[in-house]
A protein has these predicted regions:
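Active-site-adjacent beta->alpha loops and helix N-cap segments on the catalytic face
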Residues: 15, 66-82, 97-101, 119-132, ...
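N-terminal capping/lid subdomain adjacent to the active-site entrance of alpha/beta enzymes
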Residues: 1-88, 93-102, 106-110, 236-281
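Shared catalytic-loop signature of beta/alpha-barrel
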Residues: 106, 112, 123-140, 145-256
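A cross-domain feature marking catalytic cores of carbohydrate-active enzymes
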Residues: 28-30, 62-64, 90-94, 118-120, ...
């Protein structure tokens, strides 16, 4: 896709359907679990949440996985500092069995959490479906589905309210487009899972730029770009030869980022940087 874009002097978003969105809201992902007491984590998470909000991100996502009771303490603490109207998401990375996930999910309902991500094992379609039926918080997932066939099962079994395809995990843009179309054909909003380098972020920004709104009345559902705020990632800062800063855009544009019109994905890897990771047999 990148070669085709460069060959035809066309940005990726034009190749995959054209611009549907001038700007994409960005949410900050942080608040990772550490080997600390719950009280220490509460203090750390609250400070990190304040920082993410102060940088103009439109929403934020936090980790859980200490156990149901301790996790709800963490979420309540973060909700307290960001306010009741700020969009907050919770990512469990399939930390729970079904009963524990139901307990946590009912607690999240009371805290007006936007989504509960990967609450149970990705293979547990029955568990996902039961959670979706019994709690009000949106169930999000799909980053661990690596083919359109797996996604078809996830959707057919009515497991999720929000689809989170991971373009890198799916093997690339072509398979992603099939999965995205499948989700949209079943009226499931697509909010991509984003993890990795500047290449991944740039590709996702193009894909979301070309993503049509989901039906939903006067104010249809909008997607968001996930951005890791946890630490400096040299594969974001040092990999591209071009100036590429999502943080600067978020700060300057009130939480939004826009794609460039550079041909292809808009990122040219710095070959000298990549040589540091070269493996010689």
């Amino acid at each position: 896709w990148d070669i085709l874009g460069k060959k035809t002097n066309t940005p990726l978003y034009q190749l995959v359907g054209g611009k549907c969105n001038d700007q994409i809201p960005v949410y900050g992902y942080g608040m990772m679990l550490q080997k600390k007491s719950t009280s220490e984590l509460i203090n750390l998470f609250q400070e990190e949440a304040k920082q993410i909000k102060s940088k103009n991100f439109k929403a934020m996502k936090m980790k859980v996985g200490l156990g149901p009771t301790e996790d709800l303490k963490l979420v309540r603490a973060v909700r307290e500092v960001v306010g009741k109207d700020f969009k907050l998401m919770v990512d469990a990375n399939h930390a729970y069995n079904l009963n524990d996930a139901l307990y946590v999910g009912r607690g999240l309902d009371e805290l007006d959490i936007f989504w509960f991500e990967e609450p149970v094992a990705p293979e547990n379609y029955d568990g996902y479906r039961e959670l979706k039926q019994k709690i009000n918080t949106n169930i999000a997932g799909g980053e661990a589905e690596f083919t359109k066939y797996g996604w078809n099962e996830l959707i057919k079994n009515k497991c999720i309210d929000i689809a989170q395809p991971e373009v890198c995990g799916l093997g690339g843009i072509t398979e992603y487009l099939k999965v995205s179309a499948l989700a949209q054909a079943n009226f499931i909003p697509v909010i991509n899972h984003v993890w990795g380098s500047a290449v991944s972020i740039a590709v996702n920004l193009h894909l979301l730029t070309a993503q049509p709104d989901m039906p939903g009345g006067l104010f249809p559902s909008k997607s968001m770009l996930e951005f890791d705020t946890t630490e400096k990632n040299i594969f974001i800062t040092d990999l591209p030869t071009e100036s590429f800063s999502i943080i600067d855009q978020v700060n300057q544009n009130n939480g939004f980022a826009s794609v460039s019109d550079i041909a292809g994905i808009g990122i040219t890897p710095n070959l000298d940087f990549l040589k540091e990771f070269e493996v010689n047999e």
